């Protein structure tokens, strides 16, 4: 027996509400694990190291971010290279607190890939987007950990890990994780084509899931999804602090059949799945609450594998950008952004507005 429309709407509303409550409880669990890991990390540092790693929560440094090499974007924080072995393990435990097992493996694999990139560049087998007078130093321990405020299971604080091709940001307000964006992963090379790690594609799922969706589209759908035969040279939002929705948004999910919508959600799952399971569930709950049917998929560039290409996924509240054009189409940049939620700024504004200080 078919339920009345009003009953189905009530059921849908109840489901969204349950997802929201569940994700909030989950976010509190995740923030507690982060607070414990961050406290252990900070307590293991020397006074000088602690000074390098620690910033006021309201410091401008918290919004200072990028994904390019440190030589071209000077960074602050405590460098992994300057940590002893036990401190490095504690830093890794903090990273694990924010990421899933796959996300942690992805982040550390990207860091390790710096060694491969350095060898390729030394042999003249990696194409730079812009020639440099001096080669960049590729360093798998050239990543910085930063703590903003005092880690606590009840208070407001945040943390960041950043270096070439990894930039992860987490913000906790009153003991609840409210933001895990911007979150950036990159890979150069996108595919290792020689040497002991030949065939390695760290961010392969990001490309493969997008191609599966693209290939499922018919000619009419492709005219809406494919924006340009040429891909942009990089992500359009780059490392801006404030971003706005991009136009056009491409083919909306409401214009897809059920199979294609499933492929779209599998693509989104690739990105949410980098985060700890409870953080991923929170992202999923938010985008569903805003309306899956409003999510758009757009592509630019070649459709043949191995060629330069770009895509984006955009909903009412979030944007995913992926670009693979540098190094002759073998260098990926990808990011998840929240239009109002990056760095937790929207909830922080609401918190400051409603709470007396």
PLM features: residue spans?
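Bacterial N-terminal signal peptides that target proteins for export
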Residues: 2-12
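Bacterial N-terminal signal peptides
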Residues: 10-22
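Residues at the start of alpha-helices and the adjacent loop-to-helix junctions
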Residues: 5-6, 18, 30
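A cross-kingdom marker for long, charged
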Residues: 27-100, 105-357
């Amino acid at each position: 027996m078919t339920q009345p429309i009003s009953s189905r709407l009530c059921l849908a509303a109840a489901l969204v509400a349950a997802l929201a409550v569940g994700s909030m409880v989950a976010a509190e669990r995740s923030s507690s694990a982060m607070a414990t890991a961050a406290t252990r990390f900070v307590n293991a540092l020397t006074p000088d190291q602690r000074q390098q790693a620690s910033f006021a929560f309201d410091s401008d440094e918290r919004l200072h971010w990028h994904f390019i090499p440190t030589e071209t974007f000077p960074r602050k924080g405590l460098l992994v290279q300057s940590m002893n072995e036990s401190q490095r393990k504690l830093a890794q435990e903090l990273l694990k607190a924010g990421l899933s097992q796959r996300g942690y493996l992805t982040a550390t694999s990207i860091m390790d890939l710096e060694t491969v990139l350095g060898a390729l560049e030394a042999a003249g087998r990696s194409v730079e987007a812009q020639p440099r007078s001096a080669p960049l130093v590729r360093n798998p321990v050239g990543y910085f950990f930063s703590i903003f405020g005092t880690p606590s299971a009840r208070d407001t604080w945040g943390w960041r890990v950043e270096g070439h091709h990894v930039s992860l940001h987490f913000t906790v307000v009153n003991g609840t994780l409210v933001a895990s964006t911007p979150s950036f992963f990159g890979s150069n090379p996108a595919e290792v084509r020689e040497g002991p790690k030949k065939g390695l594609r760290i961010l392969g799922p990001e490309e493969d899931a997008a191609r599966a969706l693209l290939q499922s589209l018919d000619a009419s759908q492709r005219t809406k999804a494919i924006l340009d035969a040429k891909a942009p040279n990089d992500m359009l939002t780059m490392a801006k602090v404030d971003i706005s929705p991009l136009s056009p948004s491409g083919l909306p999910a409401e214009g897809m059949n059920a199979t294609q919508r499933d492929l779209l959600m599998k693509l989104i799952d690739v990105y949410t799945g980098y985060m700890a399971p409870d953080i991923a569930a929170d992202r999923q709950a938010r985008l569903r609450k805003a309306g899956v049917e409003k999510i758009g998929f757009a592509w630019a560039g070649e459709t043949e594998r191995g060629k330069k290409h770009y895509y984006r996924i955009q909903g009412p509240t979030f944007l995913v950008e992926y670009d693979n054009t540098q190094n002759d189409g073998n260098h990926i940049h990808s990011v998840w952004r929240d239009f109002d939620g990056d760095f937790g700024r929207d909830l922080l504004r609401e918190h400051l507005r409603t709470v007396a200080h």
